[in-house]
């Protein structure tokens, strides 16, 4: 499936709250880290970091943009205002990418757990 045109292969988010969306997002990566014995990470980040080829860089940029847009849409669907959903999605993806590097180095999901707690604090009070 083409990440650039359809990032929904990540699966539909079952959450109906903003906190649930972020927890779901963290859990996707937690499962990947655990399944790899702490050695996994984001393949797109690996390509982006090592890409000397402009075409690969463009593809990685498109994948990250698609994931950010999907996460923002899911946050908006739970009531997060559009002007907050995009930035929160961007911070979430950026934090997750850094956490994945740390998980690999530490061979632990603890960096993901820290990110999960701190991401929840970014959410606006929707009550």
Task: Please place each PLM-identified region on the residue numbering.
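Residue-level recognition of alpha-helical structural elements
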Residues: 14, 18, 56, 81-85, ...
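Helix-loop "lid/cap" segments that line or gate small-molecule binding pockets
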Residues: 11-12, 30-34, 43-53, 74
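Hydrophobic alpha-helical bundle segments that form small-molecule/ligand-binding pockets
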Residues: 53-54, 64-88, 125-127
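Hydrophobic alpha-helical connector segments
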Residues: 7-40, 89-92
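A general structural signal for well-ordered alpha-helical segments in protein cores
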Residues: 19-22, 26, 41-45, 57, ...
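Hydrophobic alpha-helical segments that form the core
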Residues: 40, 45, 83-102, 118-122
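Short amphipathic alpha-helical interaction patches enriched in hydrophobic/aromatic residues
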Residues: 6-11, 33, 55, 75, ...
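Hydrophobic/aromatic residues within well-ordered alpha-helical segments
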Residues: 1-3, 14, 18, 22-25, ...
